[in-house]
Design a protein with these regions (language model features):
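Beta-propeller blade signature
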Residues: 1, 37-68, 118-134, 183-194, ...
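Beta-propeller fold detector
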Residues: 1-7, 52-55, 69-80, 130-150, ...
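Long, acidic/polar, low-complexity amphipathic helices and coiled-coil-like
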Residues: 1-92, 96
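Repeated scaffold domains used in trafficking and secretory/extracellular systems
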Residues: 5-17, 81-94, 146-164, 205-217
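Conserved beta-propeller blade signature
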Residues: 19-23, 101-103, 169-170, 221-225
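Short, conserved, GDST-rich strand-edge loop motifs in beta-rich repeat architectures
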Residues: 23-55, 104-123, 171-182
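Long, well-ordered mid-to-C-terminal structural blocks that present hydrophobic/aromatic surfaces
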Residues: 99-178
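Loop/turn-rich, solvent-exposed surfaces of beta-rich toroidal or solenoidal domains
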Residues: 153-230
């Protein structure tokens, strides 16, 4: 899935259909950096356009086979880009399930962007791709879309996701402060549900971190290592 990286220096200089800098959207020209600056994950170079120009769309590139010689790009305006982010880290949000669908999740991280043109108006949500379709018909399922919400009805905000088995995907979700808070909750998304996330209960109250990947055993149960402030 396309991540929210905007345009590199190479992308900026491209001529498209006779238009110089053709990948820069009209009215977005001032977002192109005129000098290098920033630091850490916010570092940038002159002639780069940081972050996406299409916050209300999700684009996915699909390669036909392992030769990577033929591909197609599909897009949807039901969700924002399918990528979790924390500083310089970008996290997977596409998972193939046992039912043959690829589920594409968006935490709508673009809500945190400073410029309104790069902020999404879309809530966190899920769409899917039917991998059993022919190459010509491979696209987003027009009949499947879920808005992701917490059990109390508030919009979900999450950092990471992992496919477990069956209909279940586990999310590392933020507390009630959303993206301004701490990702210290585990919740379960059932692909056949209405999008209401189920809280994982019984976790320690002083969790300070989670392992990067859960272990899925032969019965389909997920085991997650946690660290706590009390040791």
């Amino acid at each position: 899935a396309a991540v929210p990286m905007g345009l590199s220096q190479w992308g900026y200089i491209q001529t498209v259909n006779g238009k110089e800098h053709g990948y820069v959207r009209e009215g977005y020209e001032d977002l192109v950096k005129t000098e290098s600056g920033g630091s850490g994950s916010g570092k940038y170079n002159a002639n780069e356009l940081q972050w996406t120009q299409y916050p209300d769309e999700c684009w996915v590139a699909i390669f036909k086979d392992e030769t990577l010689e033929e591909h197609k790009v599909i897009k949807t305006d039901k969700i924002s880009y399918a990528c979790g982010r924390n500083r310089s880290q970008y996290y997977q949000m596409l998972w193939k399930a046992d039912d043959g669908y690829i589920y594409v999740l968006s935490p709508s991280y673009a809500k945190t962007m400073k410029d309104s043109r790069q902020q999404t108006t879309l809530p966190a949500g899920v769409v899917r791709i039917n991998t059993n379709a022919s190459w010509e018909n491979l696209d987003f399922d027009p009949n499947y879309y879920k808005t992701l919400k917490n059990a109390n009805g508030t919009e979900a905000a999450f950092l990471r996701s992992w496919y477990i088995s069956g209909n279940y995907i586990m999310l590392l979700a933020y507390d009630e402060q959303g993206f301004d808070g701490t990702a210290n909750r585990l919740v379960i998304f059932d692909t056949q549900s209405d999008g209401i996330l189920k809280e994982v209960t019984g976790l320690p109250s002083d969790i300070s971190g989670f392992s990067s990947t859960p272990y899925i055993d032969e019965t389909g149960k997920a085991h997650m290592v946690v660290s706590t402030e009390s040791g």
